[in-house]
UniProtKB/Swiss-Prot annotation:
HAMAP family: UPF0301 (MF_00758). This is UPF0301 protein ROP_34500. Pfam families: DUF179 (PF02622). It comes from Rhodococcus opacus (strain B4). Belongs to the UPF0301 (AlgH) family. One of its GO terms (cellular component) is cytosol.
């Protein structure tokens, strides 16, 4: 069965539910350089902990230089993205399925949520290519032990928003942090106007 784009969750809850397919949008008070104005796509969230990748931090390393076989499938910019501070020497890959494409039973693809799938980088790109709109490859990931993310949510470090499949492949020229906030209802949407450099404002 094909998975269409899920309807967007346009509600902000004081007790947000994190699940695979959620976005963790850093709050304006989170000034730690590694996560300031970041958007994290949640891949796993269970009793063992949580795992996700930052989807708006392209690096200067070209995919062609490290995984040339995947470069033709990589959405622009064809750069390796910095997925987070954990295991920066390891690569994770997400892809967005084409509308109507079937991933069930395809070796190397694992559904995360809706049209977003994880791709095993040891699989055959020629098998994957007809099924996906593009892939995004990340160096490292962001991880939390059990209860750690809940503590950060209680501190209001993160805003939980449901992702659209298109968020995963957003081009570098798009301010993803502002874009996902702007599409939320007021007053949350107003945060999108928060200046990048507060000291300049």
């Amino acid at each position: 069965m094909a998975h269409a784009e899920e309807p967007e969750d346009r509600t902000a809850s004081t007790e947000p539910v994190v699940r695979p397919g959620s976005l963790l949008v850093s709050s304006t008070d989170l000034v730690e350089p590694a996560f300031r104005r970041t958007v994290i796509y949640v891949i796993e969230h269970n009793e063992a902990g949580s795992l996700g990748v930052v989807i708006n931090r392209p690096s200067e390393t070209a995919v062609h230089d490290v995984l040339p076989q995947w470069a033709p499938l990589t959405a622009r910019p064809s750069a390796l993205y910095v997925g987070g501070p954990v295991k920066r020497d390891a690569a994770l890959c997400l892809a967005t399925l084409r509308t109507g494409a079937q991933a069930d039973g395809v070796r190397g693809l694992r559904r995360v949520h809706g049209r977003v799938v994880m791709v095993d980088l040891d699989s055959d790109p020629e098998v994957v290519a007809p099924l996906v709109e593009g892939v995004r490859i990340f160096a490292g990931y962001s991880g939390w032990t059990y209860g750690q993310l809940d503590s950060e949510l209680q501190r209001d470090d993160w805003i939980v928003i449901s992702a659209l499949a298109s968020d995963v492949l957003a081009p570098a020229r798009v301010d993803v942090w502002a874009q996902v906030l702007r599409r939320q209802p007021l007053p949350l949407a107003l945060l999108a106007t928060h200046p990048i450099d507060v000291e300049r404002n």
